[in-house]
Amino acid sequence: MAAQGSLLIASFLLILLVLAKPLGSGLARLIAASPLPGVAGVERVLWRTLGITGHEMNWRQYLLALLTLNLLGLSILFCLLFWQEWLPLNPQRLPGLSWDLALNTAVSFVTNTNWQAYSGESTLSYFSQMAGLTVQNFLSAATGIAVVFALIRAFTRQNMHTLGNAWQDLVRITLWILFPVALIIALFFIQQGVLQNLSAYQPITTLEGAQQLLPMGPVASQEAIKMLGTNGGGFFNANSSHPFENPTALTNMVQMLAIFLIPAALCFAFGEAAGDRRQGRALLWAMSFIFVVCVAVVMWAEVQGNPHLLTAGADSSVNMEGKETRFGVLASSLFAVVTTAASCGAVDAMHDSFTALGGMVPMWLMQIGEVVFGGVGSGLYGMLLFVLLAVFIAGLMIGRTPEYLGKKIDVREMKMTALAILVTPMLVLLGSALAMMTDAGRSAMLNPGPHGFSEVLYAVSSAANNNGSAFAGLSANSPFWNCLLAFCMFVGRFGVIIPVMAIAGSLVSKKAQPASQGTLATHGALFIGLLIGTVLLVGALTFIPALALGPVAEHFSLP
């Protein structure tokens, strides 16, 4: 089975790199604000129609544009969900959502988290899914990519005060990257058997003679951007383990590739935009190393079997609990790491049913900030924060002012870097503590002991880091949990974006210094090792005590 796992990981990464490199070249053109071939005329018409000027923005104007778009989207989506029963395309006559669930869901999809405290097929109408959630899947993904575009320009421009035009970036990202790639993926999903219709739910008679209602809906179109935009919110409650969302092993592989496609392509784009492809490859190597190790650990943990099943007299040669037989243990383990390394959160197996160590790795990948490939845009700007921290640490060790790509990293940049890195750990630890201290928080726990605490820790980690996956043994649809997680999602998203944009505004005004003999090379194996060590060290120091109370304690309590 080790050979099968190694082959699966290698083939996945090989296909990913083959697809990501050409897409990275297209993204690099957009970073340079150069229209893609053949679309310049279309863009001119769009700018006139939408009233978008070509004036570039400083970091505050760029940030204000992004915040305005997202707050407007949040308000509209909340209204769509709250008054759902009065809107069209609701063949099942589903009622509107409660105010707290509508708020939680709206914040969730606007922040690219896609945490779901509801069952999609029994809660949301087709109109809410299409006009509400799918639209935000595009806009939230475009927002993350636009932020990293601004940060990359800050490194590549000199003595300037502008970072591009946010409205032009958002339109270009959506029309020329997200929409065409999502369309191709959606058509492939339809060919494989994923649903795409507006029919009412279909009553059927099962082989046993029982009556059953099969859910329908425009699934493929939402499924494509759900994966490509690292959104993760499923059309159905079972997410990508549902055969109507993910029917075959082939769609399962394509879904995993779609999750990592843009994050990997952005690494190539960063190297091209910086004028040194080695810089992008160094980040890709660091991400890939952590990813492969994490996949290997989860696969090893899951093929060991579940001792609880063994004591119950069940077959425990491998841990198949919570997994689909059409995917198996290895593919399910790979999917779990892919979806939590990226801030996607889609699942093709129930993470709550993984072994203690198998479930700890996805949780830890979220807790370190979703920087191992990460979300579209957010993964790269998160990793670049760790790059700045790594060069700062290296500067302290050798007694030189830290610099990256020729830009000196001063006190202002380090303050903003520290703030951005500390936002999500504070949310996770304080949010988990609040939940465990209150009756409203503890009453949602369906399991006692270390596993119950793990479910709470996983939920808050998922929300604060904008992942959206869950250990399912938590009744999270209550005013307390909806409000707590909505707060964590909102602050975890924009509490990082704001200091990142401040860093970009500071760096873009600086002049790049030529490299000297004392300059730290940021593209070699030494720096890759330093970067990996920085990520691991920050993650270990921050979360080992909490993990020791949850999955580690659960592992050592196994029979």
Curated annotation (Swiss-Prot):
How does the protein's chain sit in the membrane according to the entry? Multi-pass membrane protein
Q: Which terms in the Gene Ontology molecular function aspect does this entry carry?
A: P-type potassium transmembrane transporter activity; potassium ion binding
Q: Where in the cell is it found?
A: Cell inner membrane
What is the name of the protein in this document?
Potassium-transporting ATPase potassium-binding subunit
Q: Name one Pfam family in it.
A: KdpA
Record InterPro entries:
KdpA (IPR004623)
Quaternary structure, per UniProt, is: The system is composed of three essential subunits: KdpA, KdpB and KdpC.
Instruction: Give the transmembrane ranges.
Output: 7-27, 63-83, 132-152, 170-190, 253-273, 283-303, 327-347, 356-376, 379-399, 416-436, 484-504, 524-544
Protein purpose = Part of the high-affinity ATP-driven potassium transport (or Kdp) system, which catalyzes the hydrolysis of ATP coupled with the electrogenic transport of potassium into the cytoplasm. This subunit binds the periplasmic potassium ions and delivers the ions to the membrane domain of KdpB through an intramembrane tunnel.
> Where is this protein chiefly located?
membrane
An example GO CC term for this entry is: plasma membrane
Say which family it is in.
Belongs to the KdpA family.
Q: Which HAMAP family match?
A: KdpA (MF_00275)
